[in-house]
From Swiss-Prot:
Post-translational modification: Not glycosylated.
UniProt-recorded name of the protein: Mannan endo-1,4-beta-mannosidase A
Species of the source: Podospora anserina (strain S / ATCC MYA-4624 / DSM 980 / FGSC 10383) (Pleurage anserina)
Job description of the protein: Endo-1,4-mannanase that catalyzes the random hydrolysis of (1->4)-beta-D-mannosidic linkages in mannans and heteromannans. It is a crucial enzyme for depolymerization of seed galactomannans and wood galactoglucomannans. Hydrolyzes structurally different mannan polysaccharides, such as galactomannans, glucomannans, and beta-1,4-mannans from different sources, yielding principally mannobiose. Also has transglycosylation activity.
pH dependence: Optimum pH is 4.0.
Molecular function GO labels: mannan endo-1,4-beta-mannosidase activity
Entry EC number(s): 3.2.1.78
Catalytic reactions on record: Random hydrolysis of (1->4)-beta-D-mannosidic linkages in mannans, galactomannans and glucomannans
Quaternary state and interactors: Monomer.
Intracellular or extracellular location(s): Secreted
Keywords: Disulfide bond, Glycosidase, Hydrolase, Secreted, Signal
GO terms (BP aspect): mannan catabolic process
UniProt cross-references to Pfam families, sorted A to Z: Cellulase
One GO CC annotation: extracellular region
Amino acid sequence: MKGLFAFGLGLLSLVNALPQAQGGGAAASAKVSGTRFVIDGKTGYFAGTNSYWIGFLTNNRDVDTTLDHIASSGLKILRVWGFNDVNNQPSGNTVWFQRLASSGSQINTGPNGLQRLDYLVRSAETRGIKLIIALVNYWDDFGGMKAYVNAFGGTKESWYTNARAQEQYKRYIQAVVSRYVNSPAIFAWELANEPRCKGCNTNVIFNWATQISDYIRSLDKDHLITLGDEGFGLPGQTTYPYQYGEGTDFVKNLQIKNLDFGTFHMYPGHWGVPTSFGPGWIKDHAAACRAAGKPCLLEEYGYESDRCNVQKGWQQASRELSRDGMSGDLFWQWGDQLSTGQTHNDGFTIYYGSSLATCLVTDHVRAINALPA
């Protein structure tokens, strides 16, 4: 999702130093079986959501309460930001994960750094929630590729081949992956949130994704790996999302050995297409995943009006393909009540306990549970 407003990251409570979250217990890492996901021994279709802000909370009770609500709603997968990049170290106890500078970068493993992610992983472990952790942002929110560009030069388009940027990106990957390599809470490592390379040959992202997924696999033999792209670049239609101008080729990227499943997003309102575009977009990605023998995950989707009627139709379209390429969906985004008030409403937020949550979470989970095994 692009264009997020900065979430209020003021100090909510004192944070105790936390050991690395290393997992344990009976839960197992998520797997794939053909075009279907396997979570804790169950093969099927799974629902989930996104929360870009949860890893930046400094009040442990807020983390726990949010995850309790997600788990009790029947959602199994939660996608979060595993990045928070800055070029200048913030004052006080503001949360940041990595400071990028040409003179030398720093990964923050302190109480206002990766220890916040530690707590999230630990809390997810105890609740059986599986996390997709995105490792960098294409967009400028929370630093992203732009923070690397500020430190090492070039552009976001050249970021994928910028040797110094990629060297530091891999250092950061190693720091994060090594902390949670044994945690059953990790569903997948995600190379980037919505990677694009506008006007580039699609080989740029293809080659980068091949190299980085190989690198992650060298660090972690067990957990799943995915790209995090929006699903742009598909044959058969000429509308904008099907075109290749953003530098991605969905079908080609599915051939990358160490990418275990395909991701795609859906925002008709942002893309200038009608809501009726949705079912076909889902069907075409499912077909591509089926042909590649990998699961498809509708990783982000949202609409800003008539949301119950519009989005439940998309959910139904995805569920109907649960044995034909689709294996899950994650709506954008989860909303909750924290100790500091409601989380940010970007126009797509679905708040816990709302009538919209009944329509798009409770009813959806019930329908998933009724699917044949």
